[in-house]
A protein has these predicted regions:
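Hydrophobic residues in alpha-helical segments
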Residues: 34, 43, 65-67
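Acyl-donor (CoA/ACP) binding surface of acyl/acetyltransferases
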Residues: 1-41, 73-181
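Conserved GNAT-fold acetyl-CoA-binding loop/helix
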Residues: 38-60
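Juxtamembrane helix-loop transition sites at the ends of transmembrane segments
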Residues: 53, 59-62, 126, 169-171
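A short helix-loop-beta-strand connector motif used in the catalytic cores of GNAT acetyltransferases and
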Residues: 61-75
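Short, conserved alpha-helical segments within structured domains
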Residues: 46-50, 72, 138
Length: 181
């Protein structure tokens, strides 16, 4: 690959969306996504209480990743205003975990699927061997997004979920990019 090629959250445009890095001046937008109890019900953190918590979350989960040679940690923005309404990410750790979240008022419009498909294409192009994703069995719409992105259901497992500390049945999906798998 060309050394100048950006493998850290390169901007992607789709029909309706701009997928880009979260910026420091997006803290308020990030807070709107992360404060909603319903949006965060099935995510591995509690909804955030204030801007200070959001700044810390941004520093740990976005700014730190943007310093790495390769990362995929996107703000989902509508093309109209380029204002973050959600996020989509693929981790660089071994499982290459694929995840997303969207403000409630933007649910049921195919936005998570549109953003997810675009990021899946990007990580495939950039040479990731596969991605995985899990969803709580009680959140089947998240599984619909995984399927829309081409992922295949593998199995269900139970886990005492942290930090929320209750038993969850997770459905695990995977999508392999390398040939012969």
């Amino acid at each position: 690959l060309n050394a100048a090629y950006n493998m850290n959250t390169p901007t992607i445009k789709t029909d309706r969306l701009i997928l880009r890095k979260f910026l420091e001046n997006d803290i308020e937008a990030l807070f709107l996504i992360l404060k909603d109890k319903e949006v965060n019900k099935f995510l591995p953190w509690y909804s955030l209480k204030d801007i200070e918590e959001t700044k810390k979350f941004y520093a740990e989960r976005y700014a730190a990743k943007y310093e790495q040679p390769q990362a995929y940690a996107y703000a989902i923005c509508l093309k109209d205003d380029n204002f973050p309404i959600g996020y989509v990410k693929v981790d660089m750790e071994e499982h290459h975990d694929f995840g997303y979240g969207l403000r409630k008022e933007f649910w049921h419009r195919g936005i998570a699927s549109e953003a997810g498909k675009a990021v899946v294409e990007q990580v495939k192009k950039d040479g990731l061997p596969y991605i995985t994703a899990t969803h709580d069995r009680n959140n089947p719409r998240s599984g619909n997004v995984m399927q829309a992105c081409g992922m295949k259901y593998c199995y269900t497992y139970e886990e005492l979920w942290q930090p929320k500390n209750f038993l969850v049945a997770f459905r695990m999906y995977q999508l392999n990019f390398t040939k012969g798998q």
